[in-house]
Curated annotation (Swiss-Prot):
Positions of transmembrane segments: none
Cited InterPro entries: Coq4, Coq4_euk
Root EC class: lyase
Annotated positions binding Zn(2+): 212-213, 216, 228
Family to which the UniProt record says this protein belongs: Belongs to the COQ4 family.
The protein's name: Ubiquinone biosynthesis protein COQ4, mitochondrial
Cofactor: Zn(2+)
Gene: COQ4
The protein's assembly and partners: Component of a multi-subunit COQ enzyme complex, composed of at least COQ3, COQ4, COQ5, COQ6, COQ7 and COQ9.
Recorded superkingdom: Eukaryota
Bilayer topology: Peripheral membrane protein
Any single GO CC term annotated in Swiss-Prot or TrEMBL for this entry: extrinsic component of mitochondrial inner membrane
Length: 332
């Protein structure tokens, strides 16, 4: 028969006595406090981090973090040949510039549709001697000097596209606006200058880059490959841009036979002659002549647009279609 000893009974009574309950409460409280010390600290830390006020009152910590950030920036600067001279400037070592030229050149040849390749090649070939020559050209001209002084930035906002759309149909502004709409581009798509060291040179190259679409517009050349090559040749002969000269020489090599024939017989001869006869386009303050009559501007610049490339291509496509229909009819 099962029996309970007096000691077991007494232990059971003691376990449920008020004194022992009090002891258990103290023990559990101590465990909870210790757990809160270990775990609760992490919870409070996470809450403070989430609220963004973790170290708001700890000036020493903020100072240390700022110091570490500055050290990282200094370490990055120490890997560059010089300090950045303007916002967005990335100084390059000579071998990095050579690599940029080689890689961007190959990419531009095989993938001319990628604008980033063209942008990088342009800056890699923008030698200081060329930019200094362009600077002298601007300094010798009254308008060029004002452009260097004002440092204008061509954007949709600065040009006020809505105002351009309401200008006289034969004005420079409306001609530019109509060309942008026809080609589906915007002045805001021009990339900033990154790899040119001198701030003045960087501005000059940015100005050339931002004015590129005006050269298209006044000559009514589309942004298809033939139109781009023609404008590059025009730029090369007018202001001597090295990348433009390279593009005009090498880009036609990958074109179809009929495209080459058009370029070599019509557009490249026009581009060289027009560029040499035209006044330096880098000295044109486009923002100030938007109201001017486009024909009057062309006379002042001494430039005549080439034959309509879109029309020639369209007629060529029509002839091919007619020939194809005749051939199919003959086969039947």
């Amino acid at each position: 028969m099962f029996t309970v000893s007096k000691k077991s009974l007494q232990a059971s009574r003691n376990a449920f006595s008020p004194l022992n309950n009090s002891k258990r409460t103290i023990v559990f409280t101590a465990i909870a406090a210790f757990g809160d010390l270990l775990i609760g600290k992490d919870v409070r830390l996470a809450d403070a981090m989430e609220k963004g006020n973790l170290h708001n009152k700890n000036g020493e910590y903020e100072h240390k973090m700022e110091q570490r950030t500055q050290e990282r920036l200094n370490a990055l600067r120490n890997t560059r040949p010089i300090e950045p001279n303007y916002e967005g400037h990335v100084p390059l070592w000579w071998y990095e510039r050579m690599m940029l030229f080689g890689i961007s050149g190959l990419k531009s040849y095989f993938h001319p549709e990628n604008g980033e390749n063209i942008v990088q090649l342009g800056e890699a070939t923008a030698l200081p001697c060329f930019l200094e020559s362009l600077k002298r050209t601007m300094l010798l001209d009254k308008t060029g000097r004002r452009i260097l002084q004002d440092r204008p930035n061509i954007t949709s906002e600065s040009l006020d596209m809505e105002r351009l759309s309401k200008m006289d149909k034969n004005s420079v502004g409306y001609t530019y606006y109509k060309w942008l709409m026809k080609e589906g581009v915007s002045p805001d798509t021009r990339a900033p200058v990154t790899y040119i060291d001198d701030p003045v040179h960087a501005f000059i190259f940015k100005r050339y880059r931002q004015c590129h679409d005006f050269y298209h517009a006044i000559n009514d050349l589309p942004i298809i490959i033939e139109g781009e090559i023609a404008v590059k040749a025009f730029e090369a002969s007018n202001i001597g841009v090295p990348m433009a000269a390279l593009g005009a020489l090498l880009a036609p090599l990958r074109l179809k036979k009929v495209q080459k024939e058009r370029l070599y017989s019509i557009y490249l001869p026009w581009a060289v002659k027009a560029g040499l006869n035209c006044k330096p386009l880098i000295n044109v303050y486009w923002e100030e002549i938007l109201d001017k009559d486009i024909d009057e501007l062309r006379r002042e610049l001494n430039v005549t647009p080439p034959p309509d490339l879109r029309k020639i291509r369209k007629e060529r496509a029509k002839q091919r279609k007619q020939f194809k229909l005749k051939y199919e009819t003959y086969e039947k």
